[in-house]
Amino acid sequence: MTIDFVTLLHQSDSLLLFVVLAFGLLLGKVRFGNFQIGNTIGVLFTALLFGQMGFEFTATTENVGFMLFIFCVGIEAGPHFFSVFLRDGIHYITLTLVILLTALFLTVGLAKFFNLGPGMAAGILAGSLTSTPALVGAQDALRSGLLNLPHQTDMQSVLDNMGIGYALTYLVGLVGLMLVVRYLPSLARLDLNTEAQKIARERGLSDNESRKTYLPIIRAYRVGPELAAWIGGRTLRETGIYPHTGCYVERIRRNGILASPDGDAVIQEGDEIALVGYPESHEKLDVNYRNGKEVFDRNLLDLQIVTEEIVVKNDAVVGRHLVELNLTEKGCFLNRVVRSQIEMPFDRNIMLQKGDVLQISGEKQRVKLLANKIGFISIHSQTTDLVAFTTFFVLGLLIGSVSLVFGQLEFGLGNAVGLLLAGILMGYLRANHPTVGYVPPGALRLAKDLGLAVFMVSTGLKAGGGILDHLSQVGAVVLFSGMLVTTLPVLVGYLFGVWVLKMNPALLLGAITGARTCAPAMDVVNEAANSSIPALGYAGTYAVANVMLTLAGSFIIGFWF
């Protein structure tokens, strides 16, 4: 039996889809030094190659792909989209607007100057900014009929131009941004590490390398005369045992009676105390503690130490500084703070926002009490709330279908913006109500990445058939335009941030990469600064940038026509 694999690919959209995905994702694993091609570039380039070989994708799967992707982008942005307007929020929003508007008008100007075909500007904008949401917004604005095409303008040719412009400039945008943020501090004669340390001193920050990646442990000691004399009748609060030892007193046994002490308790000679702390804290205990005998008492040591992820929700703590929680007095250890999927540097003055995730270790009941005070413990479940997911998805489609009429002008949001807004609402509600709209991080990442990959396959296959002709005709112009749109808005944003907003350069470069929603570039800034502090700036702009970039895709189509 003979199997014609090429014929099978031509006859089966499903087989073609997953063959391109498999080869593209494999290509995305290729590394050149510290640079990895990545899934988006790998799938897009593979799809372009298959498209050039004559393969076509006629299924409607593309629509499902881009809708899943943009909806998941909204869910990710939702918890912090509104809270970004708090501390430094106006700076981050203004910076994002400056970068985006500069890129938008520059792209339109270049497209008009070089007389590029309809749709090419949208592709150049999305590719140069490495923003798939911008491409999704542009294509959806065209497909949904929000804009009336000029006479004799073929929609498919406009869509193909978008895909080709995006494909030609995406790699330029990614590598270009990484190079700019890497060498801009040197050109500006700045030591990024010094600037990062300056912020660290001002805000009491520490880097991730100093954090504990393991649980605290429990050990028990009998209070000897030396320790009792040092305490001298002072309460636990007055003694400050945690600052002195790095451990806190979880239990006391006195005259055979077990008790959980509060800050007003006084330790006496002969007491047996259970101390909770990291192993090195026990090793470095003052000699006063070691003069007493270590105790191995099952009841005294029978404590359950847990690590939980607590989602910040309660208005009483939102907007307050982390240090105000007095975690150590509550017998809790902070392992990390995550915001917008980015692990933040330790900043005792960081202002808490709804949706922040605090990873806390400590005795189970203490951690539970803390969670009740500041929010809720993230659900330990691998089950997606599909009822909420599908309901908000439908809501997004309904929002996108609404049109407003102003005289002869009809305006609608389209599916992309509608789904993005519905996703933001679902993510925001999830940050405030633990039982609504839960999607496990792995499931959300799968839906987002798979939706993006399917969209890239469709875009690449459709654009691939004419990419060689476009390369010979306008390839150099498109690549040159992509270089300008990649670099100039970043330079304008940097100068605006330094001269007008007076931002610290380390935070500013992190914010610029967030405004471009480019995590690989943020890693470059972190490496140059030898610090994770730029992540503070990245998290400040990332959520709002995703929304603005989607809208920009729709707007640039409007500018062109």
Curated annotation (Swiss-Prot):
Sequence intervals crossing the membrane: 8-28, 37-57, 66-86, 90-110, 161-181, 386-406, 409-429, 450-470, 476-496, 541-561
Q: What keywords were assigned to this record?
A: Cell membrane, Membrane, Repeat, Transmembrane, Transmembrane helix, Transport
Its Gene Ontology molecular function terms? monoatomic cation transmembrane transporter activity
Subcellular location per UniProt equals: Cell membrane
One cellular component term (GO) for this entry is: plasma membrane
Q: Matching Gene3D superfamilies, A to Z?
A: Regulator of K+ conductance, C-terminal domain (3.30.70.1450)
Question: What positions does the domain RCK C-terminal occupy?
Answer: 206-291, 293-376
Q: Which PROSITE patterns match?
A: RCK_C
Coarse class of the protein's main subcellular location: membrane
What's the protein here called?
Putative transport protein AHA_2450
The source organism is Aeromonas hydrophila subsp. hydrophila (strain ATCC 7966 / DSM 30187 / BCRC 13018 / CCUG 14551 / JCM 1027 / KCTC 2358 / NCIMB 9240 / NCTC 8049)
